[in-house]
């Protein structure tokens, strides 16, 4: 959510900034609603004051034994008019809130201006793209040939966009989770956190998934209003909702492994085969809570921490700065890490690292006390995948395949697999 004061005082500036995203904000309509709000608030307060004065006068007249019926009728008329104006004011406030909750974040000045992913800017590359002397296979072809990845069985159990993994591939998948957690905890200093995988609407509103992106979520039946979490960013970031932190507590740096559940409502026909885009997948998430002045340095660190995982696994990747037309709604600035997939002959997203600035904190009322001014200020929140586990498995399978369809294990993962160094076709 954007700053209400900024919206009220300079809606045209907001409209200009959001237009960089391709988002149309009707500043004129918003300003008209604001004028109505201010007029109704002044009028309502005036009526309230007048009714209070007349009610007091009735009490004084009654104590003197005077006839108060004419005065009571006037107060009742004022009361009816006051209730009508309160109803009108409530409706205006609801309209303003609906607009405010629909607005995306203002992009940081360093974000490249562009329309879509074609306008994203490559920042750096790491690693050499492998050259194969044989026709490469996709991860799903490799996994099915190994007899350890079964999409048909998953479709039978549930439906499309699910997978069943068995044997060494399932073990490799689990090893990746432990490897990522160990690196982030032991070397990067994150605190591990375990959170619910089911969240309520308040949590989703706080991090920005609601109300705009409900179609992307799995909502549970029943009266609780619960949803399956689409990313552990949601429950982890909400651990500071409605809190006033001390400056000494910042930065907070959490790492969390969780399953994620997404309906992929807008991805019909995209990545229909394999594990690239699934309804259920695992992710190791990094979340930072910082002071405002520290958040952009934190974004660079968070991104580098995610990069370390790819470097340890010796997977070629690149870092891309997303343009204004491609960053997520709540983000002020985002770097994507894209890993090389030989079967597609291209880089694919494996992590998205974002600075949300105060966008989520304002919704969550997540604050800290500034020791220099003693003022209560909003924190900044950041998040990034460190990494998406399934896509990391995909990248290993494709980059470490040989001509026989075997998968060689990266050196960094061998200690987690009890000496297994190759997953072989039998």
From Swiss-Prot:
GO terms for molecular function: ATP binding; serine-tRNA ligase activity. GO terms for cellular component: cytoplasm. InterPro entries: aa-tRNA-synt_IIb, aa-tRNA-synth_II, aa-tRNA-synth_II/BPL/LPL, Ser-tRNA-ligase_type_1, Ser-tRNA-synth_1_N, SerRS_1_N_sf, SerRS_core, tRNA-bd_arm. It is found in: Cytoplasm. Coiled coil: none annotated. Catalyzes the attachment of serine to tRNA(Ser). Is also able to aminoacylate tRNA(Sec) with serine, to form the misacylated tRNA L-seryl-tRNA(Sec), which will be further converted into selenocysteinyl-tRNA(Sec). Belongs to the class-II aminoacyl-tRNA synthetase family. Type-1 seryl-tRNA synthetase subfamily. Homodimer. The tRNA molecule binds across the dimer. This is Serine--tRNA ligase.
């Amino acid at each position: 959510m954007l700053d209400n004061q900024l919206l009220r005082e300079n809606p045209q500036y907001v409209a200009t900034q959001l237009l960089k995203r391709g988002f149309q904000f009707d500043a004129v309509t918003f300003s008209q609603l604001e004028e109505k709000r201010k007029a109704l608030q002044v009028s309502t307060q005036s009526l309230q004051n007048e009714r209070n004065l007349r009610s007091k006068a009735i009490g004084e007249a009654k104590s003197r034994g005077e006839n108060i019926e004419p005065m009571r009728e006037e107060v009742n008329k004022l009361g009816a008019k006051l209730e009508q104006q309160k109803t009108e004011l409530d409706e205006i406030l609801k309209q303003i809130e609906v607009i405010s909750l629909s607005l995306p974040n203002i992009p940081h000045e360093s974000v490249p201006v562009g329309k879509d992913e074609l306008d994203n800017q490559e920042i750096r590359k790491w690693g050499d793209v492998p050259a194969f002397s044989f026709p490469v296979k996709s991860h799903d072809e490799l996994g099915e040939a190994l007899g350890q990845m079964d999409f048909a069985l998953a479709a039978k159990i549930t439906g499309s966009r699910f997978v069943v993994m068995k044997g060494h591939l399932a073990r490799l998948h689990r090893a990746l989770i432990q490897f990522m957690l160990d690196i982030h905890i032991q070397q990067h200093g994150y605190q591990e956190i375990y959170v619910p995988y089911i969240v309520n609407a308040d949590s989703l509103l706080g991090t920005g998934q609601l109300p705009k992106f409900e179609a992307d979520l799995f909502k549970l039946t029943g009266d609780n209003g619960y949803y399956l979490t689409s990313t552990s960013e949601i429950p982890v970031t909400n651990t500071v909702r409605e809190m006033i932190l001390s400056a000494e507590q910042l930065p907070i740096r959490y790492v969390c492994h969780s399953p994620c559940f997404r309906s992929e409502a807008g991805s019909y026909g995209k990545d229909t085969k394999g594990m690239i885009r699934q309804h259920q997948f695992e992710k190791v998430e990094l979340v930072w809570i910082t002071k405002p002045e520290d958040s952009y340095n934190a974004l660079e660190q968070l991104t580098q921490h995610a990069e370390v995982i790819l470097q340890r696994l010796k997977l070629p990747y690149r870092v891309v700065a997303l343009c204004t037309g491609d960053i997520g709604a709540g983000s002020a600035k985002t770097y994507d890490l894209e890993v090389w997939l030989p079967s597609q002959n291209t880089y694919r997203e494996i992590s998205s690292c974002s600075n949300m600035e105060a966008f989520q904190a304002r919704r969550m009322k997540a604050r800290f006390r500034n020791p220099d001014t003693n003022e209560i200020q909003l924190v900044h929140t950041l998040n990034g995948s460190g990494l998406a586990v399934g896509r990391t498995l995909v990248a290993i399978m494709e980059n470490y395949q040989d001509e026989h369809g075997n998968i060689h294990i990266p050196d960094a993962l061998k200690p987690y697999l009890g000496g297994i160094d190759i997953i072989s076709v039998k």
